[in-house]
Amino acid sequence: MSNTQTKNVPELRFPGFEGEWEEKKLGNLTTKIGSGKTPKGGSENYTNKGIPFLRSQNIRNGKLNLNDLVYISKDIDDEMKNSRTYYGDVLLNITGASIGRTAINSIVETHANLNQHVCIIRLKKEYYYNFFGQYLLSRKGKRKIFLAQSGGSREGLNFKEIANLKIFTPTIFEEQQKIGQFFSKLDQQIELEEQKLELLQQQKKCYIQKIFSQELRFKDEEGNYYKGWNKKQLKDVLEFSNKRTINENEYPVLTSSRQGLILQSDYYKDRKTFA
């Protein structure tokens, strides 16, 4: 990547690409912008197998969270065929507190369906889906989504507002693809590191349980276990302190109490604290 001062050209860029990026409305780059609906009967129609049914909780930052995935029958899916989503669709939460969360549909083996809280953004073939998914995940993309929200509560996006989102994009498909794949590799690496972190956290939790129950004990350099633990009251291992944080001639410091905010000097006048 190299630096450039040219207008509408990114500061960092992969070598081999030239020319300015163009600002385009998202609606001009897509073949579909639309959402789904909840089946008649709601959750009573959810099953443990069938067609994956995506809800807002399945849309995370850049990827699908399938831990809480539900399914619908083929018959219901046929009734809702207009809200089917396919591999490579950009999915965007458009209502509620999770508005703006974005993911790429990564379900390869079949299509999925979705409810009315999630919007399908399906790019034309000449535009690389993950470039635009990553753009919506960026700070600039999130800000545009926030500013586009409708209503006094600012917790809703309609299709017109989504279609009118203006995005700077490379004119060459290969550059879009290069950028999208670059971020995909970073996301994969992050996911691996998160899995490692989760394993370490589970390991720590297990060690804490075993060590503090003395099920697991350490040995000294000679291979002998350290002496047994002693049971003490907390006050026996703490040091009393009457120190205050300010001098009398400095600005007063308030502290919270059951009576509300009072001077720290009054609160600790006849009290002891632990250090």
Residue ranges and their predicted role:
Residues 39, 49, 55-56, 67-139, ...:
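A short beta-sheet element
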Residues 1-18, 192-228:
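Short amphipathic coiled-coil heptad-repeat segments
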Residues 6-10, 111-119, 150-174:
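A short glycine-rich beta-alpha junction/loop motif
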Residues 177-189, 193-194, 230-232, 236:
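Extracellular/lumenal glycan-associated surfaces
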Residues 46-64, 240-261:
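Short beta-strand/loop turn elements enriched in aromatics
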Residues 12-37, 164, 220-245:
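Non-catalytic DNA-recognition/assembly elements of restriction-modification systems
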Residues 42-45, 52, 137-167, 245:
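Specificity-determining recognition surfaces
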